[in-house]
Design a protein with these regions (language model features):
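Alpha-helical transmembrane segments and their membrane-interface boundaries
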Residues: 1-101, 132-152
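Transmembrane helix boundary and interhelical junction motifs in multipass membrane proteins
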Residues: 46-50, 118-124
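Membrane-helix interface "capping/anchor" motifs
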Residues: 62-70, 111-121
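Generic transmembrane alpha-helix signature in multi-pass membrane proteins
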Residues: 86, 111-114, 123-130
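Internal alpha-helical transmembrane segments of multi-pass membrane proteins
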Residues: 91-117
Length: 152
């Protein structure tokens, strides 16, 4: 009996829509390149969050979390929660872990309450809580989510 652990097949959707997938992947690559170019690796969590948003927008465009309301609303919630949590004093490792976890938990709660669920935005909250927010970070995140929503 053959092991199927490492076997995979190219699906019929790829064979049919390979041009679309290629264009989507190139657009995603360009989008993430621009984000990485403008943000330092100090903001790796935020870059990863935008990367995950890029995947959702291009690979799952019909999904609930790919909707413009969710992408923009979720990241705005993430930015705000992360910023507010970054203002809380956290002098120890334990208090830092608690503040960072609260950024994720509170942003998740607000996204669910406002119907703006976008999982990568919890990463934005975490990244901003950990590194703080600067004008360049704010501009890059907002421009990224707006551009991704337009391309969607």
């Amino acid at each position: 009996m053959k092991s199927k652990i490492f076997s995979f097949q190219i699906g019929w959707k790829f064979r049919r829509y390979w041009k679309n997938y290629t264009i989507q992947s190139l657009l995603a690559t360009g989008s993430v390149f621009i984000v990485i170019y403008f943000l330092s690796m100090q903001h790796a969590v935020i870059v990863a969050s935008i990367g995950a948003t890029t995947f959702i927008v291009f690979a799952m465009p019909e999904g609930l979390t790919a909707k413009t309301r969710n992408v923009i609303g979720g990241h705005i919630v993430g930015l705000l929660c992360g910023f507010l949590c970054s203002l809380v004093s956290h002098p120890s490792i334990l208090s830092s872990a608690l503040v960072y976890a609260l950024a994720v938990g509170v942003s998740m709660f607000i996204m669910v309450a406002t119907d703006t669920e976008h999982p990568p935005a919890a990463g934005t909250a975490l990244g901003v809580a950990m590194t703080g927010i600067t004008l360049p970070v704010l501009i890059v995140v907002v421009l990224s989510i707006v551009i991704l929503s337009i391309l969607h």
